């Protein structure tokens, strides 16, 4: 086997071939949630029990699940990350930017898990295209180092709004998140 054959084999195993958006009850949703749960348990000792309403799932050509991320429209729902803020996300963002953004133009992103390096960048690119096509202007999220790095590699500028303070969660929720807040 030549070096070129090896490279092609590696690419065939790691280049995403399909992106799906799964809502509750959709085929494959349970597997995606189990994938997220397992990753957070291994990485942070967390016991994730709630998943965002829509999961974007990245599959390799052979069907292997490579990465997931979830998102929720801000229009009608309180966002998980608003627990860390003293005001609604649109007000916090307006104070930071100097102009007002409408809540219905925002989505919250979370449940990010990648099996292989680079998976986050593929999903972020796919999510960006999807959200732009759907008329969204802002994706808001709590960013661990891995996510900040993925955005940096894509030359996406982040607008920090404040720290994710674990003490703002109720006691049970703090336990469920394990060591996540230490990253």
Predicted regions and their residues:
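Generic preference for hydrophobic/aromatic residues in regular secondary structure cores
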Residues: 17-21, 71, 158-160, 164, ...
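Compositionally biased, intrinsically disordered low-complexity regions enriched in proline and serine
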Residues: 41, 85, 137, 181-182
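Intrinsically disordered, low-complexity, charge-dense segments enriched in Lys/Arg
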Residues: 2-10
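Accessory, usually C-terminal, subdomains that scaffold auxiliary metal cofactors
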Residues: 165-183
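A conserved beta-strand-loop-helix scaffold within acyl/acetyltransferase catalytic domains
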Residues: 16-104, 110
């Amino acid at each position: 086997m030549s070096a070129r054959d090896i490279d092609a084999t590696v690419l065939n195993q790691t280049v995403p071939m399909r992106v799906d958006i799964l809502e509750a009850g959709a085929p494959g949703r349970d597997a995606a949630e189990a994938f997220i749960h397992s990753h957070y348990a291994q990485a942070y000792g967390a016991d994730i029990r709630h998943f965002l309403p829509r999961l974007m799932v990245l599959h390799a050509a052979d069907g292997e699940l490579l990465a997931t991320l979830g998102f929720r429209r801000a229009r009608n729902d309180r966002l998980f990350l608003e627990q860390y803020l003293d005001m609604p996300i649109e007000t916090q963002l307006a104070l930071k930017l100097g102009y007002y953004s409408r809540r219905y133009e925002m989505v919250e992103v979370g449940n990010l898990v990648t099996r292989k390096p680079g998976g986050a960048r593929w999903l972020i690119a796919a999510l960006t295209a999807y959200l732009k096509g759907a008329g969204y202007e802002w994706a808001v999220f709590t960013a661990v180092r891995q996510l900040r790095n993925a955005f940096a590699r894509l030359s996406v500028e982040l607008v920090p709004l404040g720290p994710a303070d674990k003490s703002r969660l109720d006691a049970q929720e703090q336990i469920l998140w394990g060591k996540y807040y230490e990253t």
